[in-house]
From Swiss-Prot:
The chain crosses the membrane at residues 38-58, 82-104, 119-139, 185-205, 231-251, 295-316, 328-348, 355-374. GO terms for biological process: mitochondrial electron transport, ubiquinol to cytochrome c. It comes from Daucus carota (Wild carrot). A ubiquinone binds at residue 208. This is Cytochrome b. Its main location: mitochondrion. GO terms for cellular component: mitochondrial inner membrane; respiratory chain complex III. Belongs to the cytochrome b family. Heme b b566 binds at residues 102, 203. It is a multi-pass membrane protein. The keyword Nucleus does not apply. Heme 1 (or BL or b562) is low-potential and absorbs at about 562 nm, and heme 2 (or BH or b566) is high-potential and absorbs at about 566 nm. Disulfide bonds: none annotated.
Length: 398
């Protein structure tokens, strides 16, 4: 390319050159599989949520007397409003499904290991922001479940010693959930996705500092290809499959992931018989309920995110990252995955036997995974031949 052509090339301009470097010509391992496509797919979901949210905000009124009716106005009177709302509501679930797959892929292939600790930590921050954004986004429809969900969850802050009641009053903007609560929750719900964009850019920058991990879990600095067009074409298969999967919910079962009580206007007088959070809160809800004491249940939530942040430092397997070559860790990983699904199921069950007992065992298994995480890696470091000698069935025979 001549100097003149380079000067007038769009991709050589300051801002576009950064996009070209990180999204088009970014060197990528040549052996990535389809599981690696969940990262870019999460970015697409974030863009969809922001775009649909902005258009919905144009027709929404954050007032306790008008909020529920404004949502119905969007559904009935705004052209294409039903599509925007269902895409936004179900898109939140799709977004979190994609992120869960992305996180469990990272756990399996060891993408959190050194030198990518900051990639993992920034990802956990993004996940925490997503959880907060999803929770406060459940309040604006101002149905029964929105009102009582906000009341129950925010009142958990009262378990904090000394300042708990003050924090609850500050969150509510008064002595109960009301108009001030709805206004501040709607404002935060509009703001936080843009913070998510900033955190995602940091996450992407941290990833590109050392390059992407690969299914073998080894560093490869030579066997790489450009992201475009190879992985764009490959990821296109996953994007189309995801679009079809999402369309099934949007067009044929838009309310299956919601709660019917949220189609009843918020009323502080009658309490719903069974207050159930959205599916993505169910594991946290199960851990919260596993401890009878309110303060103890709230205190058990913080270690969940602390363990996720500490994961890169708990892993003692420095050179062999992928679970494909770590048989013991592979078994532990599958048990952890099963326990995570069990927590989600327990979180939506009533507080009665045998669900109470199962709900107390499942969080113990969840935290046990992080407690024993260093052991397989330490054994492997002290005796590299241990696994090949004792678990030869895990490796293909020559």
């Amino acid at each position: 390319m001549t100097i003149r052509n380079q000067r007038f090339s769009l991709l050589k301009q300051p801002i576009f050159s950064i996009l070209n470097q990180h999204l088009i010509n970014y060197p990528t391992p040549s052996n990535l599989n389809y599981w690696a496509g969940f990262g870019p797919l999460a970015g697409i979901c974030l863009v969809i949520q922001i775009v649909t949210g902005v258009f919905l905000a144009m027709h929404y009124t954050p007032h306790v007397d008008l909020a529920f009716n404004s949502v119905e106005h969007i559904m009935r009177d705004v052209e294409g409003g039903w599509f925007l709302r269902y895409m936004h509501a179900n898109g939140a679930s799709m977004f979190l499904i994609v992120v869960h797959f992305h996180m469990f892929r990272s756990l399996y292939y060891g993408s959190y290991s050194s030198p990518r600790e900051f990639v993992r930590c920034s990802g956990v921050v993004i996940f925490l922001l997503m959880i907060v954004t999803a929770f406060i986004g459940y309040v604006p429809p101002w149905g029964q479940m929105s009102f009582w969900g906000a009341t129950v969850i925010t009142s958990l802050a009262s378990a904090i010693p000394v300042v708990g009641d003050t924090i609850v009053t500050w969150l509510w903007g008064g002595f109960s959930v009301g108009n001030a609560t709805l206004n501040r929750f709607f404002s935060l719900h509009y703001l936080l996705p843009f913070l998510l964009v900033g955190a995602s850019i940091l996450h992407l920058g941290a990833l590109h500092q050392y390059g992407s991990n690969n299914p073998l879990g080894i560093n490869s600095y030579t066997d790489k290809i450009a992201s475009y067009p190879y992985y764009y074409v490959k990821d296109l298969v996953g994007w189309v499959a995801f679009a079809i999967f999402s369309s099934i919910f949007i067009f044929y079962a838009p309310n299956v992931l919601g709660h019917p009580d949220n189609y009843i206007p918020a009323n502080p007088m009658p309490t719903p018989p069974h207050i159930v959070p959205e599916w993505y809160f169910l594991p946290i809800h199960a851990i919260l309920r596993s401890i009878p004491d309110k303060a103890g249940g709230v205190a058990a939530i913080a270690p969940v995110f602390i363990c996720l942040l500490a994961l890169p430092f708990l892993n003692q397997s420095m050179y062999v990252r992928s679970a494909k070559f770590r048989p013991i860790y592979h078994i532990i990983y599958l048990l952890f995955l099963a326990d995570r699904l069990l927590l989600g199921w327990i979180g939506c069950q009533p507080v009665e036997a045998p669900f109470v007992t199962i709900g107390q065992i499942s969080p113990f298994v969840f935290f046990l995974f992080f407690a024993i995480m260093p052991i397989p890696g330490r054994v492997q470091r002290e005796n590299p031949n241990y696994f090949s000698e004792n678990f030869a069935f895990s490796y293909p025979k020559k």
